[in-house]
Design a protein with these regions (language model features):
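Chalcogenol-based redox active-site neighborhoods
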Residues: 5, 12-233
């Protein structure tokens, strides 16, 4: 006798399969969208242009952790600009709510909000980017971060619990690593910071090529672990 499935189980399986097939993974081209924001309607691809993008969601407007996060991102604009990065925030609140909250952010965080907040009231973007946990409140986006490169490829995702604010210094560190390793045959070791030694990718073995690519030389700790000064410094 076959297994009998009730409607709730079938619905769960269908939803799980749908979510799995629509998840955006590292290296994927992220989907485009048009959505309302505090800066008017935004066509994401057009707005992003040739920049890197930090797209980050927050659970709700007028909440304490999110207020500090959006203020921090505004203060970091000079650092984002140096790296050719645009920031854009998102929650499922409407534009009027966002605009009311902006005043609180600017007052309490002593800054000017200098980037758009997407008003994803219809959950269009949240669903595209899988920002709503299946077992959580459907009206609350998780605290996610997406780093997207100029080719519209997803390069990094972070997901934080609602109780924990994001570490934006770590976000800048990872962007530094991505931009460096896109242009040089290196990787960045644990706890690396801009200006510190990096490691040569193991696939490079030809001594002449190594000499050409790394004129400052390198230290071979193991054949697969070779340290060299950061090449763009």
């Amino acid at each position: 006798m076959g297994v009998l499935w009730d409607d709730s189980i079938l619905e769960y399986i269908c939803l799980s399969n749908y979510r799995e097939s629509h998840m955006v993974r590292l290296g994927d081209t992220v989907p485009n969208f048009t959505q309302a924001s505090t800066y008017g309607d935004i066509d994401f691809y057009e707005w992003a242009g040739d920049s890197w993008v930090v797209l980050f969601s927050h659970p709700a407007d007028f909440t304490p952790v999110c207020t500090t996060e959006l203020g921090t991102v505004a203060k970091l604009k000079p650092e984002f600009d140096k790296r050719n990065v645009k920031a854009i925030a998102l929650s499922v609140d409407n534009v009027e709510s966002h605009k009311g909250w902006v005043g609180d952010i600017e007052e309490t965080q002593s800054t000017t909000l200098n980037y758009p907040i997407l008003a994803d009231a219809d959950r269009k973007v949240s669903d595209l980017y899988d920002m709503i946990h299946p077992n959580a409140n459907a009206a609350v986006t998780v605290r996610s971060v997406f780093v997207i490169d100029p080719n519209k490829k997803l390069r990094l995702t972070f997901t934080y619990p609602p109780s924990t604010g994001r570490n934006f210094d770590e976000l800048l560190r990872v962007i530094d690593s991505l931009q460096l390793t896109d242009n040089y045959s290196v990787a960045t070791p644990a706890d690396w910071k801009d200006g510190e030694d990096v490691v040569i990718v193991p696939s490079l073995k030809d001594p002449e090529v190594l000499k050409q690519k790394f004129p400052k030389g390198y230290e071979e700790v193991k054949p697969y672990l070779r340290l060299t000064p950061q090449p763009n410094k």
